[in-house]
Amino acid sequence: MTRILEIGGRRLPFLRWSVLRMLLGMRGLTRNWQVGDGREEALAAHVLAHARPGDLDEAIRVIDDFCVTRSVMMNVGDEKGEILDHAVQRVSPGLLLELGTYCGYSGLRMARVMPEGARFCSIEFSPANADIARRIWAHAGVGDRLTVVVGSLGDGGATIERLCSEFGFTDGGLDFAVVDHDKKAYLPDLERIQRERWLHPGSVVVADNVKFPGAPEYRAYLHAEEGRTWRTIEHDTHLEYQSLVKDLVLESEYLGEPA
């Protein structure tokens, strides 16, 4: 499998065995949110060994290289990462929420472009993944700017209470959110965020993997609310680090509740 595609100046493999291993391992993801072959811990070791301490750009580059040359990860990746970068830059958010930390790659990208003094909180179901992200962030020199909380918005209110009491989530205070966790939780968690009234008109929510593995209920909801409570741009792209499987990233601006 050697066919190559060039995207954004990088030559990406058309499809590789590590992609297939990742897809085959997806059944286990809902249990522990790791592929199951040790690639997450291997990534952390690789970053600590090969990225210069305190160099954020280098950490991102080393992760991308690991994913292209060794094992594909469930990161947003470099192609879709540029969509995320541009969205953060446009919004210039003061408070960011991420659902689904995984190994911390998206957090690194957002730390690079979010304003100085912005607050970033990422929610991760897996304690093992949260630990990996913290180590990578600390090595990249941004551990003091990025926070990961182990939990989920659907855990009966415990995580939501922590966000409010410990991290300053208040009515209208959330400027930017990234949704990249359990695809079945995309819509329920968006609805939870709306019920908490954290959003304000102009808040932006970016959702990865809407086409593959797919979040059809989330997409259908935003289509139904288009021009009413949300305005959405659909970005045609590819599943991370390959060029065969197509994907969608949805970038949705909150318009406020209709009168």
Where in the sequence are the language-model features?
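Hydrophobic packing residues within well-ordered alpha-helices of enzyme cores
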Residues: 110, 133, 137, 160, ...
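Conserved SAM-binding loop and adjacent beta-strand
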Residues: 35-37, 52-55, 69-83
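Active-site segment flanking the S-adenosylmethionine/decSAM binding pocket
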Residues: 146-213
